[in-house]
Swiss-Prot record:
Modification 2,3-didehydroalanine (Ser), positions: S146
Post-translational modifications reported in the UniProt record: Contains an active site 4-methylidene-imidazol-5-one (MIO), which is formed autocatalytically by cyclization and dehydration of residues Ala-Ser-Gly.
EC number, as in UniProt: 4.3.1.3
Location, primary (coarse class): cytoplasm
Superkingdom of origin: Bacteria
Listed transmembrane segments: none
Entry protein name: Histidine ammonia-lyase
Enzyme superclass (EC): lyase
Gene3D superfamilies documented for this protein: Fumarase/aspartase (Central domain) (1.20.200.10), Fumarase/aspartase (N-terminal domain) (1.10.275.10)
Family to which the UniProt record says this protein belongs: Belongs to the PAL/histidase family.
5-imidazolinone (Ala-Gly) cross-link, renumbered residues: A145-G147
GO molecular function terms noted in the UniProt entry: histidine ammonia-lyase activity
NCBIfam families assigned: hutH (TIGR01225), PRK09367.1 (NF006871)
Organism: Treponema denticola (strain ATCC 35405 / DSM 14222 / CIP 103919 / JCM 8153 / KCTC 15104)
Length: 507
């Protein structure tokens, strides 16, 4: 997949840019204007170091130690020691795409020119991204204020030639990884250490990728529901645009319209005799999926602001030579948003699992064989995939409990309220994985039901779905290892190109 380079300006980054850099290796460039702003703000910091003017994190200690004066000669040690002491994350390492997203967002903050870092700091971030030096970053340890200190410190370690990093697929010492890539460690001064580790790029980087996945899962959920409509010969009156215009939530209107497009041309819909309405899991898809769609759209708006925001502290304003301490590092906007996203995405799986149950249950599936298998008894068919889906949605109910309602004091009670935003973001990555599996099971189950129903002519979109599914997964005629089928279905819906192809077919 060929992707365009991403030019970092400090204010124009998109969610799509983050995905391109994090997952597709897009080249990163720093704009000329950004380079100038970085130099201008660094001069202000240099003046403070020389003068000894009391300024947080430059001529003072950190947190509760902010009353301790730091001399000019101690400044370099202050910045280096900050990194060494704060690199205490634990747990499994973040995957490569998340680390790359984090690095890009930290670079974008520096590009704004309000961080006061040495130009070599953003330069090495650019080089590490482009040459594939990926720091080993433990996933746990952030309180979400003052930002993501512990996690970001592990990235900073590699930048100064410490810590560990991956290079060409191998984990090695950070200094060795830099050397193999032809890079040299940076020497920190001024406000560099604080400028690297203070802020919200970890929770925002995770969130940006999770948002992209959520948007694709929403499409996959609508597609899965459309195929279930085919299997149940669903009644499309509930999708009538007049109903949805009378309750004009955008997500609801868009969902109903999309499913109608998916089903256009189908010969199976609206063919049940003596029945005028479907159960809620079909009839209310626009209302349920639509509510998730609106929540996801809100999350995009928040993240588009945050990934272009300056979440460092203190901030340097070169125009009037001011350096001001504030609280932009506090992750509450992202914490609440990630919790919201988790709830919205979880609900897509909740209703999907109920459709799966309705498909396999002989008392509910409208005359299809029990568990969608002929010669049941000796064959169990799709009995246990529904168990798996039920297990995953139940796990998500635990994961969807909000992290942002929690707080705990730290740093001698100086930092007496925190966001837990990175915990919220980490949870959504697990929720997304679980939802993707549930939707894969729904696609697989719905395709089996359609074959057993004997659908003669599919809709524009559902027909494309069936062709894609059956290209990789044959109809189940006797028991086999369904794990393999689920993994194939998972691969199908995880591929953005497949989702886009079906979406285009339904237009």
């Amino acid at each position: 997949m060929k992707v365009k380079p991403v030019t970092v300006t400090g204010s124009s980054l998109t969610i799509e840019d983050v995905v391109a850099v994090a997952r597709h290796g897009a080249e990163v460039k720093l704009s000329a204007d950004a380079k100038k702003r970085i130099k201008d703000s660094k001069k202000i910091v240099d003046d403070i170091v020389k003068s000894g003017k009391p300024t947080y994190g430059i001529s003072t200690g950190f947190g509760e130690l902010s009353t301790v004066t730091i001399t000019k000669d101690q400044n370099g040690a202050l910045q280096r020691n900050l990194i060494l002491s704060h690199a205490c994350g634990v747990g499994n390492p973040f995957p490569e795409d998340i680390v790359r997203a984090i690095m890009l967002l930290r670079l974008n903050t520096h590009a704004s020119g309000f961080s006061g870092v040495t130009p070599s700091v953003p330069d090495i971030l650019v080089d590490m991204l482009n040459k594939g030096v990926i720091p080993y970053v433990p996933e746990k340890g952030s309180l979400g204020a003052s930002g993501d200190l512990a996690n970001l410190a592990h990235i900073a370690l590699v930048m100064i030639g410490e810590g560990k990093a991956y290079y060409e697929g191998k984990l090695m010492e950070g200094k060795a990884a830099l050397a193999k890539a032809g890079l040299k460690p940076v020497v920190l001064s001024g406000k560099d250490g604080l400028g690297i580790i203070n802020g919200t790029p970890v929770m925002s980087g995770i969130g940006a990728l999770a948002l992209h996945d959520a948007e694709q899962l929403l499409k996959a959920a609508n597609m899965g529901a459309s195929l279930v409509f085919e299997a149940f010969r669903g009644i499309t009156a509930a999708l009538d645009p007049r109903i949805h215009k009378s309750r004009p939530h955008k997500g609801q209107i868009d969902t109903a319209a999309f499913i109608l497009k998916m089903l256009k041309g189908s010969s199976s819909i609206n063919t049940r005799e003596n029945d005028v309405q479907d159960p809620y899991t079909l009839r209310c898809v626009p209302q349920v999926h639509g509510a998730s769609a609106d929540a996801i759209a809100y999350v995009r708006k928040v993240l588009e602001i945050e990934i272009n925001a300056v979440t460092d502290n203190p901030l340097v304003f070169p125009d009037n030579h001011d350096v001001i301490s504030g609280g932009n590092f506090h992750g509450q906007p992202i914490a609440i948003t990630m919790d919201f996203l988790g709830i919205a995405v979880s609900e897509l799986a909740n209703i999907s699992e109920r459709r799966i149950e309705r498909l396999v249950n002989p008392q509910l599936n409208g005359g299809l064989p029990a568990f969608l298998i002929e010669n049941g008894g000796v064959n169990s068919g799709f009995m246990i995939p529904q168990y798996t889906a039920a297990s995953l949605v139940s796990e998500n109910k635990v994961l969807a409990h909000p992290a942002s309602v929690d707080s705990i004091t730290s740093s001698g009670n100086k930092e007496d309220h925190v966001s837990m935003g990175t915990t919220a973001a980490r949870k959504i990555t697990e929720i997304v994985k679980n939802v993707r599996h549930v939707l894969a099971i729904e696609w697989l189950t719905a395709a089996q039901a359609c074959d057993l129903r004997g659908v003669k002519k599919y809709g524009k979109g559902t027909g494309e779905m069936m062709k894609l599914i059956r290209k990789h997964i044959s109809k189940v005629t006797e028991d086999r290892i369904l794990y393999n089928d689920i993994m194939k279905a998972l691969e199908i819906i995880s591929n953005d190109e497949n989702i886009d192809m079906i979406e285009n077919a339904a237009k």
